Amino acid sequence: MWNIFKNKSGQSHKVKDKFQLDLDNIPKHIAIIMDGNGRWAKERKLPRSLGHKAGVETIRDIVKECNNIGVRYLTLYAFSTENWKRPKEEINALMELLVNYLRKEVAELHQNNVVVNTIGDVSKLPKACEDELMKAYNKTKNNTGLVLNLALNYGGRDEIIRAIKLMYKDIEKKGLDIENVNEDLLKNYLYTKGMPDPDLIIRPSGEQRISNFLLWQCAYSEFWYSNIKWPDFKKHHLHKAIKDYQNRNRRFGGV
């Protein structure tokens, strides 16, 4: 089955829809825990760095497909606050991959109307990474298509603590009544301010945990797990996850 439709930028797309997706019920926000790169490499007796490199190829394909089918926000868990515990050589390889990805891909992402955004404390990343992220954002910030959130040096608990500290400073400065502190106010201090919570969170590789990812935002997200490791995750796996999402009844605590 082929579907022809227009995205937010008015561009026409032709998509082979194996799972007969309902294009009127595409998740606005998909978040992915990109897991399994290291184990993928180990199974092939390759260095872990080559697993991460293979994972970058998957990013390219999934970003393109999400943009094609009308997803508005795609958040990729790229490097957590806990990932600093990994060997220094692996961390350096990941940072180099990030820089190379941005340098190679930003022009095409910009051409495809994608916004490149970051969530997390990027000030602790190497300067080359921080500089390339800023360049990518400045180049794409006025685009109107898919918003690609790269979660870097990100942790859900860290984000909530940061938000509370920022909110407390404003309460002191502006003299806000503590009784007016509510969910809507706190959301304004999260990295994802102004974005919808993720409708669908995908985790490949066989692991079934949240790993400190979008803890505040995932309260009513639908979760989809797969044994496929991230470097082997293809467009049809994305379609299957979305189809499963479309077959669920989201009640948000109701009946």
From Swiss-Prot:
Mg(2+) binds at residues 35, 222. One of its GO terms (molecular function) is manganese ion binding. The gene is uppS. Catalyzes the condensation of isopentenyl diphosphate (IPP) with allylic pyrophosphates generating different type of terpenoids. It comes from Clostridium tetani (strain Massachusetts / E88). Belongs to the UPP synthase family. CDD domains: Cis_IPPS. It holds the Pfam family Prenyltransf. Substrate binds at residues 36-40, 48, 52, 80-82, 84, 86, 203, 209-211. Homodimer. GO terms for biological process: polyprenol biosynthetic process. GO terms for cellular component: cytosol. The keyword Oxidoreductase does not apply. Its cofactor is Mg(2+). InterPro entries: UPP_synth-like (IPR001441), UPP_synth-like_CS (IPR018520), UPP_synth-like_sf (IPR036424). The active site is at 35, 83 (proton acceptor). The keyword Magnesium applies. This is Isoprenyl transferase. Keywords: Magnesium, Metal-binding, Transferase. Its EC number is 2.5.1.-. Binds 2 magnesium ions per subunit.
